[in-house]
Amino acid sequence: MSNNQQTLGFQTEVKQLLQLMIHSLYSNKEIFLRELISNASDAADKLRFKALSAPELYEGDGDLKVRIRFDEKKGTLTVSDNGIGMTREQATEHLGTIAKSGTKEFLTALGQDQAKDSQLIGQFGVGFYSAFIVADKVEVRSRAAGVPAEQGVLWTSAGEGEYSVEDIEKKERGTEITLFLREDEKEFLNEWRLREIIGKYSDHIGLPVEILTKEFDEEGKESDVKWEKINKAQALWTRAKGEISDEEYQEFYKHISHDFADPLVWQHNKVEGNQEYTSLLYVPSKAPWDLFNREQKHGLKLYVQRVFIMDDAEVFMPNYLRFMRGLLDSNDLPLNVSREILQDNKTTAALRKALTKRSLQMLEKLAKDEAEKYATFWKEFGLVLKEGVGEDFANREQIAKLFRFASTHTDSSEQSVSLADYIARMKEGQKAVYYITADSYVAAKNSPHLELFNKKGIEVLLLSDRIDEWMLSYLTEFDGKPLQSITKADLDLGDLADKTEAEKEKAQDEALSGFIERVKTLLGERVKDVRLTHRLTDTPAVVSTDNDQMTTQMAKLFAMSGQPVPEVKYTFELNPDHALVKKTAALTDESAFADWVELLLEQAMLSERGTLENPTAFIKRVNTLLAG
């Protein structure tokens, strides 16, 4: 029986992905078998879960397995399973389209760098489409569990612009994928080559993987064929840690994450007592392309008593640890658990707390023992981890320990300095951790606010990530030391201030009080205050905000997110030792005085904000003053 055939076009994104994948993954083409076996394993997991409430879905066959056979004459390789199967609608939906949000942007980001592209495509999760790396035609026969045999579906494509679907009769439940291998891919029609690949990539899968093998008699003639199990078929996390090699842990990570790169670190734990569970947690080495897409699913694979329940159980990890991968196998949750039940469950809350603590400990150990790997982690996931101080008050100090920053101490844009490093180097009498926020490392490093600190040899953290101002609104101290912005008007160096200089500064303040009043009268309500400053060495003037005011960087953050921005009124600070300020103070012509004060204010605003409200007026003023 075969009818109702339809020919349909691939979604544009699928066409792009197929072309990119065939070219960029060709050097690692054997992974197609890992991906197909992994999908078959997932199909078995889904059937087991559904059969908990509907055992009739097993149709009398609960012995789930993956089977692989090949036909040298026809040049075909077939991977089949007796898992959940697909309906015609599901085959069209899953094999003809990609439902991930942001796919278009992801594909646009891919360029001509094949090594980089293969990593990105690996993160995306190529799954079924990897078959086209080695095949010029693929046929998928499938029947969903619980539907009649005549409701099977045949999906066929050459991996170009279109595919066809038609109804077929299929007695066995599950999915059978047949690859018509390209002429130069016949190496995959060799039993020992297939055994090698399966041993390498699929030994850890809890489902038996069987290969159709030939038996020969004493004369070397073929006497029989039989199915032979060629993997351990024991779920990796149920085995003793001492029996599992690093390679097996790494391959299992790739199986559950569909990432091509090895993880940075992992931890396998079996917990007994009030709670009984096994966790296997991984820290990836590369951030997924959609890490900042809040709608994208994340979380752990959830098993209950070794029965698969769901992918992406996000409730067991806080959002700031959404990069963590792995699985949780609990003995305490009910087998009929749903996402709704998980949300309001004491066991869930206890597991989340324990897994969060374990994840942070993993990162702390990585930072302590393997600095180079931790630097990789921080570069990939540091921005996400910074969200933690606002989301997880209980672990705030432990999260902050993991932060890394650029600093005037290192003279490098690399974020490698921890808060503990900074505190260990603090000068005698220093009571605060000093920092500056800016749009970029270069802007922070060259800020005039740093001049006094550089002169006195006081270290300052240079913060330029967009999230930093938000983070600092939650992280106000560390290890008993307040975090203090050096751009604040009311900055107090305390014991670090020089008493001799203080007397000189007091005399200058008195001598120039008339000048300050003239500037205040001129600028009026446009600034909050005008004062002399003694923290500049090379710059004539800066603007600053008070401690209780919104900073420039926070105002920019509000504006970028479309929120109304409160007016920021600055304190205008003038350097009495600078030649331009001395020249301005000595002017008696009020028009010239006004021009120079305006120029100094505009310079200070440009340095602080990076933009001016009226750049044309500024340029005109500069030209007028230069012309003399």
UniProtKB/Swiss-Prot annotation:
Its main location: cytoplasm. The keyword Zinc does not apply. SMART domains: HATPase_c (SM00387). Homodimer. Belongs to the heat shock protein 90 family. HAMAP family: HSP90 (MF_00505). This is Chaperone protein HtpG. The gene is htpG.
